[in-house]
Amino acid sequence: AALFVSIHADALPKREGDAQGATIYTLSDKASDAEAEKLAEAENKADAIAGIDLTEEPAEVADILIDLTQRETRTFSNRFARTLANEMKNVARMHKHPLKSAGFKVLKAHDVPSVLIELGYVSNKADLQQLVSESWRSRTVASVAQAVDAFLGKRVVLATP
């Protein structure tokens, strides 16, 4: 896969406040804030990169290969997250800090740029109104598609010799 996008809507118990707006998460070993940390699951170390089994490699070699691949993938993930936030801000109410990072399991692929989009909070009245609006969902999907097209187009240009 050239890109992985996981789309969610969240809820927050009343006692934890009134979160609102869309947020885009990328993978990080350390959460960008307490809210991101609460949403993320514990990290598991993967054994393969791009389908290559590293279990037979010396641990040092496997760790170096995983680290190099993760660095490049995180750079691409962060670049896509910025592109996505730029597209989404025209149609979606964004969180006051729309770009965050945390150790979500769904973002663990070492070799595929990945983001998790929280479109909003069903526990917030204004967000819920947007989430149930077919028109809003269509516009939001279109903005995500534009971001994907823009990102993949740039990657093709960068990869062309």
Where do the language-model regions lie?
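Active-site-proximal helix/loop segments of hydrolytic enzymes
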Residues: 1-161
